């Protein structure tokens, strides 16, 4: 009885000290700690809050992803979303937003609407918000099943797929902040 009580009382301290050591891949650990678990955005918070409005948390996560991956070219859906464009330019001014029909394969694809869920454009990184809604949910499932290498990170609303050839195929279900 005493051992059970001791385990119950020391559980919060053990949980606090665990600190994410269950993630063994260096890429996954760095991505989770520097992008997904981080709350601040290093200096541009006021400007991002002015751009994002009510959707600050989602756009802050997107900002951190763009800042982390530093994509040269980005495809966004919907293509005329001024807020997405401003967030990308704030995070990485050197990124070029391209149309989906261009021959170049984008480094990153961001989907926040039902546009763009018809086909895979070959991007190394996919960021899909509201992935729990159709047709984005079925697109996410199709992408995950067809991908042989890479990692995906998701919670109940957002899905981030990193398709890099050097990564093993793994899925992480975590709370995105």
Annotated model-derived regions:
Residues 126-129:
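Short beta-strand/loop segment that forms part of the nucleotide-sugar
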């Amino acid at each position: 009885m005493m051992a059970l009580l001791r385990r119950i009382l020391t559980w919060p301290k053990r949980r606090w000290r665990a600190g994410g050591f269950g993630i063994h891949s260096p890429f996954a650990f760095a991505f989770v700690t520097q992008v997904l678990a981080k709350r601040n955005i290093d200096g541009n918070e006021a400007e991002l809050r002015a751009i994002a409005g009510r959707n600050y948390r989602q756009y802050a996560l997107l900002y951190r992803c763009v800042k982390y991956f530093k994509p040269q070219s980005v495809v966004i859906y919907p293509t005329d979303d001024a807020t997405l464009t401003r967030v990308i330019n704030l995070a990485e001014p050197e990124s070029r937003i391209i149309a989906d029909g261009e021959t170049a394969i984008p480094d990153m694809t961001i989907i926040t609407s039902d546009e763009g869920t018809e086909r895979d454009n070959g991007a190394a990184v996919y960021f899909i918000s509201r992935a729990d809604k159709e047709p984005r949910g079925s697109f996410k499932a199709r992408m995950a099943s067809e991908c042989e290498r890479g990692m995906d990170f998701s919670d109940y609303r957002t899905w981030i797929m990193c398709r890099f050839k050097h990564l093993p195929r793994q899925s992480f279900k975590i709370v995105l902040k």
